[in-house]
Amino acid sequence: MTYAYLFKYIIIGDTGVGKSCLLLQFTDKRFQPVHDLTIGVEFGARMVNIDGKQIKLQIWDTAGQESFRSITRSYYRGAAGALLVYDITRRETFNHLTSWLEDARQHSSSNMVIMLIGNKSDLESRRDVKREEGEAFAREHGLIFMETSAKTACNVEEAFINTAKEIYRKIQQGLFDVHNEANGIKIGPQQSISTSVGPSASQRNSRDIGSNSGCC
């Protein structure tokens, strides 16, 4: 299937926060309760519709172990979007967000869109990180924020698509050089219009990116 743009994503965060499960739920609409640890990187892709345009999302799921951090860093380059994931039942995964964020911003484009995800919202009774803490971290660092459940699929679709909406908004504003694939964006065969157009009504509508969305 042809597409207007290809956006490259990277999923980052500690081991066991559910990165691979989020990818599987988004691409295959299924949950795998037992998942082998990611070694290096895994890959998935899916087409979505943003503002009437077909967008191909190319998603790289990275290993969370410290021993693979150098490999992960190489994938930041050329990523238009990042999903930074923590587990709401494990505070240490939230405490490590600053380190992951520093890595991401040091090795990526300054315009990369970062979505902060508090995963495993289905385990409310075991919650160790308040939603308000995630919201505050996102505000402080200029991130989009959502809580998700890879198990129930709650907000999984929205997290990936809202990240794409924000990337597309930046394209419309001229913040991304879409002719430089190092920015994680590739022009597809569908896309022939100039990317230097100003904000449109549809673009302005896309700014409602759901940072306050509830879960289930």
Curated annotation (Swiss-Prot):
Motif Switch 1, chain ranges: 37-42
Residues annotated as binding Mg(2+): 20, 38, 61
GO biological process: defense response to virus; Golgi organization; innate immune response; macroautophagy; positive regulation of exocytosis; positive regulation of type I interferon production; protein transport; vesicle-mediated transport
Stated name of the protein: Ras-related protein Rab-2B
EC number per UniProt: 3.6.5.2
Function description: The small GTPases Rab are key regulators of intracellular membrane trafficking, from the formation of transport vesicles to their fusion with membranes. Rabs cycle between active GTP-bound and inactive GDP-bound states. In their active state, drive transport of vesicular carriers from donor organelles to acceptor organelles to regulate the membrane traffic that maintains organelle identity and morphology. Regulates the compacted morphology of the Golgi. Promotes cytosolic DNA-induced innate immune responses.
Classification via SMART domains: RAB, RAN, RAS, RHO
Keyword Nucleotide-binding listed: yes
GO MF term (any one): GTPase activity
Catalytic activity: GTP + H2O = GDP + phosphate + H(+)
Annotated domain remarks: Switch 1, switch 2 and the interswitch regions are characteristic of Rab GTPases and mediate the interactions with Rab downstream effectors. The switch regions undergo conformational changes upon nucleotide binding which drives interaction with specific sets of effector proteins, with most effectors only binding to GTP-bound Rab.
Protein family (similarity comment): Belongs to the small GTPase superfamily. Rab family.
Motif window: Switch 2: 63-72
Organism: Homo sapiens
Keywords: Cell membrane, Cytoplasmic vesicle, Endoplasmic reticulum, ER-Golgi transport, Golgi apparatus, GTP-binding, Hydrolase, Lipoprotein, Magnesium, Membrane, Metal-binding, Nucleotide-binding, Phosphoprotein, Prenylation, Protein transport, Transport
Activity regulation (record text): Regulated by guanine nucleotide exchange factors (GEFs) which promote the exchange of bound GDP for free GTP, GTPase activating proteins (GAPs) which increase the GTP hydrolysis activity, and GDP dissociation inhibitors (GDIs) which inhibit the dissociation of the nucleotide from the GTPase.
